[in-house]
Amino acid sequence: MKIFFLFIILLGIIQLSNSSSCNIDIAGDSFDLTPLKKIDGYHKVISDYGDIVYFNFCNTTIDTPCGNSALAYFFDGSTGECHSLGVQEFYSLNSYEEKKTLLINIRGGDIAYDSMVKMLEMFIAFTCDESDDTSEPSLINTMEYGYASVIWTTKYSCAIKTPNVEKKLITNENQNNNNFQFENNEILNEAQSNAFEISNKNEDLNNNNNNNNNNNNNNNNNNNNNNNNNKINSGISFLQRLNQMSQTINNRNEYQQFEEQQNEMQENRAEIVQFNDDIKLIDLEQKQPFYNDDQLMSQTNDDIEFEQDQTNFDTVNDDEIANQINDFMNNFEKTQNLDGDYINQEKIIPNIIMEDTKPNDLTQNFEIENEF
């Protein structure tokens, strides 16, 4: 009975340890992030502007000031608002560098309405440094392109070697030892034939060993420097790729905005051309004389009277004018009195010119003048 209870307790401990473990296998490499995982809590990184990113990984939700239903949250320090960064994890491996970088992408966050509709997300880059076991995550980007990015350099980010790789390494090591022993036997056989040569060769071997040791030390130092440089370059290249991806997305958005602006400018040009045509038409209309109804009636009456005068004038033909002149001359000769004087012509000429008189009227006027 006691054994049964001990078995149940041991099984519960094993299940608890499995639930708290964080092992990731990808592309033939295995990573153990269990020491970095928060069982009761969350990781927090703060930007210089007061923005905060809360996160955890290995599909473990967190209880944060922003909520407890997502794997990561973003707190906007300028507005005081919280946004979910995602609820699902996706893994990828950067194998372009000597030391591989494990990338965890948390997706499915809140929807953001910017130049285009997209969902917020987060990237966590784990870079390997076998000598660092106390580092903390560093915030690289906070929602500039719709995602938050964190880089974490630690020894727990290094891939675990598989048994096949270890066996291969051991086999290579044994083969090297056999080759080394074979070479030593040849040297000993040659040394037995000539002691002087043995001693010189031993000295040469010692010198070579010293040189090899110095070279090994230099190589170790160079390897350490290269490892540090590779670690830095790995993180930098990863961030550069992220920025290139973001820049590509932004370039597409900017190109779409550029096309929209070009279309809008063409529409504005068409409106401007139409507006200029309307202005020219208005100017032409303003240059034409404008009359109201009274002015039009007055102008029309004046034109009618002028046409009537022209009609009356045209009805007097040349024969009538010649007859009037002959009558005038005949009457003028009769106006001479006994003293040989002539009646003032001004009294007769205006009547002929201003009035349409007949010869009988002229004779009547002449007789009236003589009576006075």
From Swiss-Prot:
List the PROSITE patterns hit by this protein, alphabetically: MRH
Query: Any signal peptide, and if so, which residues?
Result: 1-19
Its localization reads: Secreted
The organism's taxonomic lineage, starting at the top: Eukaryota, Amoebozoa, Evosea, Eumycetozoa, Dictyostelia
Protein name per its UniProtKB record? Putative uncharacterized protein DDB_G0278881
> Which organism was this protein described from?
Dictyostelium discoideum
Looking up Gene3D superfamilies in the UniProt record yields: Mannose-6-phosphate receptor binding domain
Task: Give the primary localization class.
Answer: secreted
Q: Which InterPro entries match?
A: Man6P_isomerase_rcpt-bd_dom_sf, MRH_dom
Q: Where is this region: Disordered?
A: 201-233
Which chain regions cross the lipid bilayer?
none
Where is this chain compositionally biased, Low complexity type?
A: 206-230
Note the coiled coil stretches, chain numbering: 185-282
Could you tell me which residue ranges the MRH domain spans?
20-160
